[in-house]
């Protein structure tokens, strides 16, 4: 991580990139975990990050920002608040109390399922999906599929970090989802 004395010399994207810590061999050997907690611990970095998202979507005529469980919940509601739009949680299965739609997706070992309240948005609502990171793209694709099923217009998927070598961003773009990511890291 760079020292704060050099922060003024960095552009916003470089500044955000410099606040993401790489943790080797976590949660398992061979994985280079991209840890956003140092970014979250800095009020300045949070402001820069939120401003990047807000500037991107201020004129997009959105109805909602959807956040993916769990780290998407950190940034998405803040961006929704700043844009004066609603927030839609897309949760891990079994966490929402009302009637839901579910979508399962493949993980490296097994499957996972996310769900959304069936009345979370209505046909034609314009939504951006936000998460912390795009790796394999499975969670964001599941979120897109859920929103599509509700009739929403998924304007874009957005994340702080893209890990393009894992193929998720290519998969999502190949499925017709426009993407915005603040920064990217090579490798896993």
UniProtKB/Swiss-Prot annotation:
Biological pathway: Purine metabolism; AMP biosynthesis via salvage pathway; AMP from adenine: step 1/1
Family matches, as Pfam families: Pribosyltran
Keywords: Cytoplasm, Glycosyltransferase, Purine salvage, Transferase
UniProt-listed Enzyme Commission number(s): 2.4.2.7
Highest taxon of source: Bacteria
Localisation per UniProt entry: Cytoplasm
Enzyme superclass (EC): transferase
Keyword check for Cytoplasm: yes
Gene Ontology CC annotation, any one: cytoplasm
GO BP term, pick one: purine ribonucleoside salvage
GO molecular function: adenine binding; adenine phosphoribosyltransferase activity; AMP binding
Gene3D superfamilies associated with the record: 3.40.50.2020
Chief localisation class: cytoplasm
Reactions that this protein is recorded to catalyse: AMP + diphosphate = 5-phospho-alpha-D-ribose 1-diphosphate + adenine
Entry keyword Membrane: no
Family that this chain belongs to: Belongs to the purine/pyrimidine phosphoribosyltransferase family.
Record's subunit section: Homodimer.
Functional summary from the UniProt entry: Catalyzes a salvage reaction resulting in the formation of AMP, that is energically less costly than de novo synthesis.
Protein name (Swiss-Prot/TrEMBL): Adenine phosphoribosyltransferase
High-level lineage: Bacteria, Pseudomonadati, Pseudomonadota, Betaproteobacteria, Burkholderiales
């Amino acid at each position: 991580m760079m020292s704060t004395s050099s922060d003024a010399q960095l552009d916003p994207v470089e500044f955000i990139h410099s606040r993401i810590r790489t943790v080797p061999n976590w949660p398992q050997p061979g994985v280079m975990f991209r840890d956003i907690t140092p970014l979250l611990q800095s009020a300045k970095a949070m402001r820069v990050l939120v401003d990047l998202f807000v500037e991107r979507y201020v004129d997009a005529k959105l109805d909602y920002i959807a956040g993916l469980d769990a780290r998407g919940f950190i940034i998405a509601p803040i961006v929704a608040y700043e844009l004066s739009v609603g927030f839609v949680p897309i949760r891990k299965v079994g966490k929402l109390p009302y009637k839901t739609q579910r979508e399962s997706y493949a993980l490296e070992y097994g499957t996972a399922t996310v769900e959304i309240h069936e009345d979370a948005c209505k046909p034609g609502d314009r939504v951006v999906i936000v998460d912390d990171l795009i790796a394999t793209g499975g969670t964001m694709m599941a979120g897109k599929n859920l929103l599509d099923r509700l009739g929403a217009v998924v304007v874009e998927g957005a994340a702080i970090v893209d890990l393009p070598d894992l193929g998720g961003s290519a998969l999502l773009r190949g499925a017709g989802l426009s993407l915005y990511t603040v920064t990217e890291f090579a490798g896993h």
